[in-house]
């Protein structure tokens, strides 16, 4: 039996675990200090009462002969998919119900989606960014190219025509910098992806924090994005229940046709 050799290429520890240890050590040494936590994107308030009630109602329903229904639909309950449809429609973006896939969270989807793509693909990852993007691809053995960002470009990397990537990660607003792309900037990425037959994995976990009308809250607000992008979303941030585990991914029908063409 052979083990996956690429696991040896992972860093010895996870970034957020390191941060937690450093914070704990500092707090022990300085108990009088109030710490503003800028590590993992956790929440600081309890679950909203409406969320707790919905969980209670669902559990109570499953405890009755009439309400018990075992495994749910493999792609998510229609009532939730329809609610997500309405959420997008309220911002002017139309989705079909069968383009929405409910899951146990964005982090799982970000990893599981890679099963669709060959390990020979080259991955473009902004730096700094959510470390899971890198770890998921390191363990698969894909080549990773970093798009360096800094104050000089507002921590927003832009396409480089000299670089050929097959899978492009975009997180907007970005974790950890908070930088968010304008529609014009996202259009440049969409154009690059279509030109290079690339796929954009668009992490929209923090879209609910956008209030500036010049900034897109969904990649699908951009013309042509439905042909080259997958959008991953998390209820941990919009509904404030980190650890409860629920999210969804949007895969437009136009992308399905594009993937058939590429393959």
Residue ranges and their predicted role:
Residues 2-104, 112:
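N-terminal small-domain helix-loop-helix segment of the aminotransferase-like
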Residues 204:
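Walker B catalytic acidic pair
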Residues 66-191, 207-222, 226, 230:
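Conserved core of the PLP fold type I
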Residues 172, 200-201:
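Residue-level marker for buried hydrophobic side chains located in beta-strands
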């Amino acid at each position: 039996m052979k083990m996956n050799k690429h696991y040896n290429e992972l860093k010895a520890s996870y970034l957020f675990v390191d941060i937690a240890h450093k914070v704990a050590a500092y707090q022990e040494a300085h108990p009088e200090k109030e710490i503003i936590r800028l590590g993992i994107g956790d929440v600081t308030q309890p679950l909203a009462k409406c969320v707790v009630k919905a969980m209670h109602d669902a559990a109570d329903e499953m405890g009755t002969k009439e309400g018990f229904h075992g495994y749910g639909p493999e792609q998510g309950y229609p009532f939730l998919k329809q609610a997500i449809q309405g959420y997008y429609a309220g911002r002017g973006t139309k989705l079909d119900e069968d383009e929405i896939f409910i899951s146990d969270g964005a982090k799982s989807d970000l990893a599981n989606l890679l099963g669709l793509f060959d390990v020979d693909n080259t991955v473009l990852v902004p730096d700094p960014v959510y470390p899971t993007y890198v770890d998921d691809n390191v363990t698969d053995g894909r080549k990773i190219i970093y798009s360096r960002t800094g104050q000089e470009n507002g921590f927003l990397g832009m396409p480089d025509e000299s670089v050929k990537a097959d899978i492009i990660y975009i997180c907007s607003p970005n974790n950890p910098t908070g930088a968010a792309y304008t529609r014009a900037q996202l259009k440049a990425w969409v154009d690059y992806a279509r030109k290079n037959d690339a796929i954009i994995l668009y992490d929209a976990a923090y879209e609910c924090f956008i209030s500036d009308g010049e900034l897109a809250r969904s990649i699908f607000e951009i013309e042509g994005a439905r042909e080259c992008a997958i959008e991953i979303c998390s209820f941990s941030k919009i509904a404030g229940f980190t650890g409860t585990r629920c999210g969804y991914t949007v895969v437009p029908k136009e992308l399905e046709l594009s993937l058939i063409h590429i393959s």
